[in-house]
Amino acid sequence: MSLTNEKIVEAIAEKSIMEVMELVKAIEDRFGVSAAAPVMVSGSAAAAAPVEEQTEFTVTLKEAGAKKVEVIKAVRAVTGLGLKEAKDLTEAGGILKEAVSKEEAEKIKKELEAAGATVEVK
């Protein structure tokens, strides 16, 4: 049986932090390496670090628009809130979801805009 990298990562993800720490120590001992990050010597301060692409987004409801009932239904579907909480959030505006992937944020935005809401993804 051949282990793929994906299977190995999945197996590690199921372990506790203590088990992962023991695994790292065993790998260090077995291969004679260290998990410590190497120290980089900077040639100049002008060398800019690469810009990291944003991976987590926040979806914010700015305005409900004219179709308030449709927006409340969409907010309930997206957030899992009860009717009163969804109505309050729709009327006041605010953060619907935090720390979501770009794909999920775009999906939520499309659903709410289709219902008539104004949505912002940050």
Curated annotation (Swiss-Prot):
Molecular function terms from GO: mRNA binding; structural constituent of ribosome
Pfam families: Ribosomal_L12, Ribosomal_L12_N
Gene Ontology cellular component list: cytosolic large ribosomal subunit
GO biological process: translation
Keyword 4Fe-4S: no
Coiled-coil region: none
Transmembrane region(s): none
InterPro entries documented for this protein: Ribosomal_bL12, Ribosomal_bL12_C, Ribosomal_bL12_C/ClpS-like, Ribosomal_bL12_oligo, Ribosomal_bL12_oligo_N_sf
UniProt KW keywords: Ribonucleoprotein, Ribosomal protein
Superkingdom to which the source organism belongs: Bacteria
Family, similarity comment: Belongs to the bacterial ribosomal protein bL12 family.
UniProt subunit comment: Homodimer. Part of the ribosomal stalk of the 50S ribosomal subunit. Forms a multimeric L10(L12)X complex, where L10 forms an elongated spine to which 2 to 4 L12 dimers bind in a sequential fashion. Binds GTP-bound translation factors.
Its job: Forms part of the ribosomal stalk which helps the ribosome interact with GTP-bound translation factors. Is thus essential for accurate translation.
Name of the protein this chain belongs to: Large ribosomal subunit protein bL12
